Amino acid sequence: MSFDGFFLHHIVEELRSELVNGRIQKINQPFEQELVLQIRSNRQSHRLLLSAHPVFGRIQLTQTTFENPAQPSTFIMVLRKYLQGALIESIEQVENDRIVEMTVSNKNEIGDHIQATLIIEIMGKHSNILLVDKSSHKILEVIKHVGFSQNSYRTLLPGSTYIAPPSTESLNPFTIKDEKLFEILQTQELTAKNLQSLFQGLGRDTANELERILVSEKLSAFRNFFNQETKPCLTETSFSPVPFANQAGEPFANLSDLLDTYYKNKAERDRVKQQASELIRRVENELQKNRHKLKKQEKELLATDNAEEFRQKGELLTTFLHQVPNDQDQVILDNYYTNQPIMIALDKALTPNQNAQRYFKRYQKLKEAVKYLTDLIEETKATILYLESVETVLNQAGLEEIAEIREELIQTGFIRRRQREKIQKRKKLEQYLASDGKTIIYVGRNNLQNEELTFKMARKEELWFHAKDIPGSHVVISGNLDPSDAVKTDAAELAAYFSQGRLSNLVQVDMIEVKKLNKPTGGKPGFVTYTGQKTLRVTPDSKKIASMKKS
């Protein structure tokens, strides 16, 4: 079910009973299109979430906690000016549309009484949140600015007069008079599609359910449907404020708890996508630059292949110095390396010995270039490997991991810290319980955690796991120095799951004691080398991994 006007009617009733006469204590904007108000009401603190997201737009109380940006937006600064300490006078739905108006009162800087309306319009990609002066109807601020060039019907900019979205001819099913309703029910075709055009705020699921019940005693069936008590119901794919037929779902105490559960993974994945998009773009750009650099370096190294030829020519000129003429641009000598004659180019301005030294200098220069380029190539390859590991964890990260990965990229110099951006606190390492019911397995979810786990936490005798030859997490069996094969398999499956091979049917995983790992000098976080490992072959299983998670 969509967040339609029918659902909104029920949740507005819920919010009204909880929040009216409460005071707004804090206002934050954890994400670009979402707003959270902390409200004190009925001796309790509530968090009110307003979302103008194009897919997950909604209004609800939430138990979810959010990390707020260090630098508040202009929108938040204006809202704090007008709403901090404000009293909530009313919360109303506009007809049965997906628009909610919350009227608040407060005092300005000189103590005068002011009223404002916080409006949320839940309209797909056109969703918005606005603060409007109650008396003048002027927009004080809006979360998404919409100019005349974007919408000729109404301009949504600070200072503009607020104009509501265009209304339709459809009727409010909650307030329609019996006479008009009776006429419609008797004369109109009561299909779901037609019901949606006749009445405001009916999503597809609501209209389908209404069509199903309007078979006999239509007037009373209609009234009962819209007057029934709220009984939130959640299925795997949808939610409703009341149970619908053929919909075996989980009941909830209130609509806000239902929405928290329904949107938790969906909204978090989208937030992760939003937060990670900048980092992914940066990492992809750096990968592209370094791959291009590697090709160039390898091409330059290939050009040094004739270094040995210069050395041999210098040796031959030195050996047969008495046969080398002056004032000639070439000489043919016996090549004792190949037992074939060889023609050697000469500089007529130089003596035979100087020509020999010229070839030795060329050889030495190329030899130094080979070492320099070989070192550069190894460094570039290590950077590419590191960035690929960051890309892998970004694609598997949750919100907390994203913040840590950003901190990692700041520390490694790939991005700059924003002004006033705080240093991110290190998240605790994830723990998993092995199949023996007692062994703890630690997993690093980014390179800083990998570094900490492998070189600070793990004991030298403990077993360490990593997906073979692909980016992934470091995994350590903690405490158990003689784990069973089943526990080793558990750890290998964790290493496979938290790697680039997560979706593969079979992943090779290296297993080795921590003491055999080597950290190269100057190596990037999480980079290790090793030899003498054993390799296991496992299949990642997401359900098993989820069941093992301890914290």
Curated annotation (Swiss-Prot):
Gene3D superfamilies: fibrinogen binding protein from staphylococcus aureus domain like (3.40.970.40), ibrinogen binding protein from staphylococcus aureus domain (2.30.310.10)
Consequence of gene disruption: About 50% reduction of binding to immobilized human fibronectin, greatly reduced mortality in mice (tested with encapsulated strain D39).
Cell compartments where the protein resides: Secreted, Capsule; Cell surface; Cytoplasm
GO biological process: rescue of stalled ribosome
Pfam families from the UniProt entry: NFACT-R_1, NFACT_N
GO molecular function: ribosomal large subunit binding; rRNA binding; tRNA binding
Signal peptide start-end: none
Assembly and binders: Associates with stalled 50S ribosomal subunits, binds to RqcP. Interacts with human fibronectin.
Protein name, per record: Rqc2 homolog RqcH
Source species of the chain: Streptococcus pneumoniae serotype 2 (strain D39 / NCTC 7466)
